[in-house]
Amino acid sequence: METNKQNNLLELFYQQYLKEKPNQIFLKSLKNLNNEFTWKETYLNILKLSQELNLFIENKDRCLLISENRPEWMITDLSIMLAKGITVPAYKTYVERDYEYLIDDCNPSIIIVSDHLQYNKIKNIIKSKPFIKKILSFEEIKDTTDVI
């Protein structure tokens, strides 16, 4: 893979996508071995999520990403880049006060969490932050209407 002709990771991914077989597995979860993404699925997921993000963010808006290492993390990171946002990655090991500091410091328009465990750490904080337009989650979070 030649890397000296691309300006960013998004371009690098796209150039490699054009070279690969669309139905070849590209990403695979370490926890759930049935959770895998082909090159084509990854590409289409990046496009779809970036279109959704464009409804809520403007150029250079920050998007807080709270997740463990998983295929959806990479898809989300590249989607944020495509939507012209800035990914602010956060460790999932942070506690509530760490997230509050980070949220106050970066003023994210969107927060993306991997699951209900991460959402529970921020749910009390986000109520007082009007700059947060939307909360997204990789997995379904029951008993809330705050998250899509």
Task: Explain the meaning of each model-derived region.
Residues 22, 82, 129-130:
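Short, well-ordered coil/turn elements that cap or connect secondary structure elements
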Residues 1-56, 61-62, 78, 104:
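N-lobe entry segment of adenylate-forming
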Residues 46-49, 73, 99:
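Aromatic/hydrophobic pocket-lining residues that form the small-molecule binding cavity
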Residues 23-25, 71, 109:
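Glycine-centered loop/turn positions within well-structured domains
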Residues 35-36, 52-94:
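Conserved AMP-binding/adenylate-forming
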Residues 86-148:
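Structural core segment of the AMP-binding/adenylate-forming
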